[in-house]
């Protein structure tokens, strides 16, 4: 093992940090500082720098999201560059791929269906829904960049107008998921380390759009944190991401289902501890590659 490694750190473009620019910047900085404190040399790049072939380091940690940048990460990974997170993992966290992979590998999630609005009448109701069912409509083709990329629909009779809004914004593929009752919890984890953190977002101010309020105040339903962590680590393995976070619903019987899963979120309530764990994981992955 070397005394130090030269590592590229690529930050996230602001458009992919809706209401979270400072928080995303803070976790990126925390990781950088923990790596430098261990003697490693980190050169910082912007997301767009990936498109100009100026990044020459063999090891990269990154928070990128754009299609072009993720595609470049995948190209570099095929050439032997080691990445946290992998460009292929970031792509898997786009909602359509994630929904299909969770179904394929039996990761608990709401009943969901992918709708192609280009070929489907906006008045057609997905067959997973009854006329009384509340649901969520979420853009399928990428990461959320604005509040109306994720829409709660209280009555399925309103689906048509919601679909039309997506089509007007040139978003032709959406995931429609049943609305789940229960306590909503938010979690952060780092694969390959003991680090795992969860909390009730409605009890804090750590929320992008405030959508957690739809489920109301948590009842404190008893559930197994070990089971939650096991589900999340399995999801991270399936999606091929090392740094992750997301949201889950705990039903009255303690059943846990994942409703959102993200590559490298903000870790806002646990930034320093999360940053330390991420830095640890980066070095572990590099050292494994060096053996």
What spans do the regions from the language model cover?
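Extreme N-terminal starter segment of soluble prokaryotic enzymes
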Residues: 2-8
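Conserved N-proximal alpha/beta basic substrate-recognition cap immediately N-terminal to
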Residues: 11-116, 120
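C-terminal active-site "lid" helix and adjoining low-complexity regulatory extension at the edge
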Residues: 30-34, 223, 237-241, 250-291
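A short glycine-rich, hydrophobically flanked beta-strand micro-motif that places a catalytic Asp/Glu
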Residues: 47, 174, 185, 241-253
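ATP-grasp fold ATP-binding core
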Residues: 102-103, 127-148, 168-181, 185
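Rossmann-like NAD(P)H-binding beta-loop-alpha module
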Residues: 110-136
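Protein kinase-like catalytic core scaffold
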Residues: 135, 175, 195, 244, ...
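Phosphate-binding site of ATP-dependent enzymes
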Residues: 151-239
């Amino acid at each position: 093992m070397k005394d130090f490694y030269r590592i590229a750190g690529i930050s996230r473009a602001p458009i992919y940090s809706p209401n979270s620019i400072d928080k995303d910047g803070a976790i990126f900085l925390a990781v950088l500082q923990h790596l430098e404190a261990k003697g490693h040399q980190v050169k910082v790049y912007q997301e767009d720098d990936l498109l100009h072939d100026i990044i020459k380091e063999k090891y990269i940690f990154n928070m990128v999201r754009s299609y072009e940048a993720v595609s470049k990460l995948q190209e570099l990974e095929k050439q032997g560059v080691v990445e946290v997170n992998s460009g292929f993992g970031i792509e898997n966290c786009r909602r359509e791929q994630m929904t299909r992979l969770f179904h394929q590998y039996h990761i608990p999630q709401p009943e969901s269906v992918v709708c192609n609005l280009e070929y489907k009448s906006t008045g057609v109701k997905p067959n997973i829904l009854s006329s009384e069912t509340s649901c969520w409509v979420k853009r399928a083709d990428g990461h959320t960049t604005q509040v109306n990329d994720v829409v709660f629909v209280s009555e399925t009779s309103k689906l048509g107008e919601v679909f039309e809004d997506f089509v007007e914004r040139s978003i032709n593929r959406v995931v429609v998921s049943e609305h789940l009752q229960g306590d909503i919890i938010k979690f952060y984890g780092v694969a390959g380390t003991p680090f795992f953190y969860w909390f009730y977002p409605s009890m804090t101010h750590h929320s992008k759009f405030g959508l957690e309020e739809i489920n109301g105040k948590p009842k404190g339903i008893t559930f197994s944190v070990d089971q939650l962590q096991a589900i999340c680590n399995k999801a991270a393995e399936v999606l091929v991401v090392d740094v992750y976070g997301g949201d889950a619903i705990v039903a009255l019987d303690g059943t846990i289902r994942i409703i959102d899963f993200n590559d490298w979120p903000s870790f806002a309530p646990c930034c320093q501890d999360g940053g330390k764990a991420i830095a640890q994981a980066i070095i572990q992955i590099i050292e494994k590659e060096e053996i």
